[in-house]
Each structure stands twice: as C-alpha cells, then as structure tokens.
C-alpha cells in the first residue's frame, strides 16, 4: 500500500471512529477497543473476557462489544454494547483501533480493516517487537488457554505503543500488507 493510499485509509478509519463514538455518545480521543462476542465463545473464554473487561475500567479506553449473547453479567461504565448484526460488526471493524481477538474471530478481517489485534497465537499474527519494529499485533498466548491476565498484559503493551503514532501507523501498515501475501 502506497503512502497516499495509507493516508486515505487512515483518514477513513478516523472518520469511522468519530461516527461510531458520536452514535454511542462518548469521546473519540481515547483508544477504541472492539470486541465481537458470538455464540461460539466458550464459557472459559467468556469468563476471561468478563475479567478482562473489569480491568479496562481502570484504563483510559472505551470498549465497544458487539454481541449476540446474553450480556447481563457485563456492566462497566467504559464498555458499550451493540447487538450483533453484520452492519454492527462491519462498523466496529472499521472504527476500532484495537480488537480483542477470540479464537472464533476472523483475524484476516481485523487486519484488512487496519485493526491491531490483541490475539492468541495465530498464523497471521506476529507479536509486535518494539526493538526491531516488526509485527502486526500483540499476542497473549494459546487459543485453548485464554487467560485474562495475559490478555490484559498484551493490551497494556498495545496501549503503550499507541502513544507513538509513527510506530502505530507502521503496525497498521504491516497488518494491511500481511493480508495481501
């Protein structure tokens, strides 16, 4: 992807984020974390997500969860719920800075939408290395062992990197190009 097309892509992403934040009535100045929770989410993963979301309350982030499952157990001031539909899924993919990837989620779709995944080990995701400035996501462990502490640690790494626009842009670019191989 050329420099101009990357600029255009990032501008569209910024506009999508602003529109979603306006629609859900919160500021767009903080990192936006997306989460797609579907019926395929195992109970152990659901429990890890609940604990993970509790931890996000102490961070300056907004979380938008698109879900087709019962969400009565989730209640946090910085977490916004949207009923699952193809349109809401598309909107969250286009708007999110970061997405928490569960084993049932589509990694390629995240990368193609310029989303930085917080992901279990996956063939499409290379753990970001700040020293060599390589990678396209932040890895938290194996798909069969979803641990909320490891997810949270990967999120903190991502949020620290988010503060550096040049590095963040490079991770997005790496993710976009990794889907075209």
What are these regions (language model features)?
Residues 1-181:
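Catalytic cores of carbohydrate-active enzymes across secretory and cytosolic contexts
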């Amino acid at each position: 992807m050329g420099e101009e097309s990357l600029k255009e892509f990032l501008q569209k992403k910024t506009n999508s984020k602003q529109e979603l934040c306006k629609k859900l009535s919160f500021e767009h100045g903080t990192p936006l974390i997306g989460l797609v929770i579907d019926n395929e989410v195992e109970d152990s993963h659901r429990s890890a997500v609940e604990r993970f979301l509790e931890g996000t309350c102490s961070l300056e982030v907004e979380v938008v969860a698109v879900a087709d499952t019962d969400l009565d157990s989730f209640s946090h001031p910085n977490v916004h719920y949207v009923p699952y539909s193809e349109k809401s899924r598309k909107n969250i993919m286009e708007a999110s800075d970061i997405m928490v990837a569960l084993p049932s989620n589509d990694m390629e779709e995240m990368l193609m939408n310029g989303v930085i995944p917080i992901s279990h080990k996956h063939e499409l995701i290379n753990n970001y290395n700040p020293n060599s400035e390589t990678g396209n996501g932040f890895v938290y462990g194996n798909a069969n062992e979803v641990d909320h502490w490891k997810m949270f640690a990967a999120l903190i790494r991502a949020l620290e990197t988010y503060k550096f626009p040049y590095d963040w842009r490079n991770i997005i670019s790496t993710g976009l190009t990794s889907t075209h191989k």
